[in-house]
């Protein structure tokens, strides 16, 4: 397999300082809405979440952005998962959004804080019934002997909750990543990409252009 000749040119318009909102959350929402409107045949809310455990070993996975407010970026997960265990040991995380057909990326660094039970419950009850059941059936990140065992656990929980509301599991919840830095990347010709980094100060955000 020869990989070194695989390359493409970036053709979209660039990004200048005057195009940027002073608040990176506003700027993020603008780009996210553009990605949604573009109908990229991919989930525009998908983000790579990178965590590091107490031994300094990194791991990452794709999760979905489920809310965004001035305080940060929200996602949900099993609280016994590897990501949750990593966050308990080291709350510093990174998020990465890649909208490659638009030649855009966003990188976020920040601190993950667990959501309240009330906030997690509100979201959990809005999920499709079978997604709620699946949350009960899976002991995320734990080993299992076969797919059949997982499907059996799902059917058992499906039968358990066939009538009435599915409650929030005690082992399921969410996190809000409170951003410290947010970088916006726009591809440009000749690899002279546009990069702007927002850095949190006491009350505002500083914006700096970075070299590609």
From Swiss-Prot:
It comes from the Bacteria. One of its GO terms (molecular function) is pyridoxamine phosphate oxidase activity. Substrate binds at residues 7-10, 66, 123, 127, 131, 191-193. The keyword Oxidoreductase applies. InterPro entries: Pyridox_Oxase, Pyridox_Oxase_CS, Pyridox_Oxase_N, Pyridoxamine_oxidase_dimer_C, Split_barrel_FMN-bd. Gene3D superfamilies: Electron Transport, Fmn-binding Protein, Chain A (2.30.110.10). GO terms for biological process: pyridoxine biosynthetic process. FMN binds at residues 61-66, 76-77, 82-83, 105, 140-141, 185, 195. It catalyses: pyridoxamine 5'-phosphate + O2 + H2O = pyridoxal 5'-phosphate + H2O2 + NH4(+); pyridoxine 5'-phosphate + O2 = pyridoxal 5'-phosphate + H2O2. PANTHER family: PYRIDOXINE-5'-PHOSPHATE OXIDASE, PYRIDOXINE-5-PHOSPHATE OXIDASE. Homodimer. Belongs to the pyridoxamine 5'-phosphate oxidase family. This is Pyridoxine/pyridoxamine 5'-phosphate oxidase. The lineage of its organism: Bacteria, Pseudomonadati, Pseudomonadota, Gammaproteobacteria, Oceanospirillales.
């Amino acid at each position: 397999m020869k990989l070194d000749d695989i390359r493409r040119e970036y053709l979209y318009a660039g990004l200048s300082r005057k195009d940027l909102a002073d608040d990176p959350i506003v700027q993020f929402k603008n780009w996210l809405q553009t990605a949604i409107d573009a109908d990229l045949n991919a989930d525009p809310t998908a983000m790579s979440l990178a965590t590091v455990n107490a031994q300094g070993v990194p791991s990452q996975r794709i999760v979905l952005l489920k809310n965004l407010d001035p305080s940060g970026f929200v996602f949900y997960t099993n609280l016994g998962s590897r990501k949750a265990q990593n966050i308990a040991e080291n709350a510093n995380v990174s998020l990465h959004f890649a909208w490659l057909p638009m030649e855009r990326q966003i990188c976020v660094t920040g601190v993950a804080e667990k959501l309240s039970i009330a906030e997690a419950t509100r979201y959990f009850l809005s999920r499709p019934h079978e997604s709620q059941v699946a949350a009960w059936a899976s002991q995320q990140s734990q080993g299992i002997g076969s797919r059949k065992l997982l499907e059996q656990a799902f059917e058992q929980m499906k039968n358990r909750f066939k009538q009435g509301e599915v409650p929030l599991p005690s082992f399921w919840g969410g996190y809000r990543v409170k951003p410290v830095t947010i970088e916006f990347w726009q591809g440009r010709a000749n690899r002279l990409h546009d990069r702007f980094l927002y850095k949190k100060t006491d009350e505002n955000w500083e914006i700096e252009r970075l070299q590609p």
